[in-house]
Regions:
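Helix-turn-helix DNA-binding elements, focusing on the entry/boundary residues of the two helices
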Residues: 8, 19, 34, 49-52
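Short alpha-helical DNA-recognition segment
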Residues: 16-39
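DNA major-groove recognition helix of helix-turn-helix/homeodomain DNA-binding modules
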Residues: 44, 48-65
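Interfacial/linker helices and their anchor residues that mediate assembly or domain coupling
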Residues: 70-101
Length: 101
């Protein structure tokens, strides 16, 4: 399965959204939302970056999450995205200090 498809499905399930609801919230017509999201999740079609941005916004994940090759990196990307700027700066400083040891 293409990594985008895997990440999309994981994020959708975590958000407790149906394929149809996610599609509608991302601006896809109600009549085709479910089918189109299914095609994205199965890797049959690839969304353009504009759609990726809309999906990311609805799912509260950064666009980079969808393209992270491994699960640990994907988790780090999401965690950093969901904390505020001060917490992110502190996490980065801690990480830099740890890596320089």
């Amino acid at each position: 399965m293409w990594i985008f498809s895997k990440r999309l499905k994981e994020a959708r399930k975590e958000a407790d959204l149906s394929q149809e609801k996610l599609g509608i919230l991302a601006g896809i017509d109600e009549m085709s939302a479910s089918a189109r999201m299914n095609q994205y999740e199965k890797g049959k079609h690839e969304p353009d970056f504009s759609m990726v941005e809309r999906l990311a916004k609805v799912l509260n994940v950064p666009e980079a999450y969808f393209y992270a090759k491994d699960d640990d990196t994907a988790l780090i990307i999401v965690k950093l995205h969901r904390i505020n700027k001060d917490e992110r700066s502190q996490a980065l400083a801690t990480l830099q200090a740890y890596l320089s040891e």
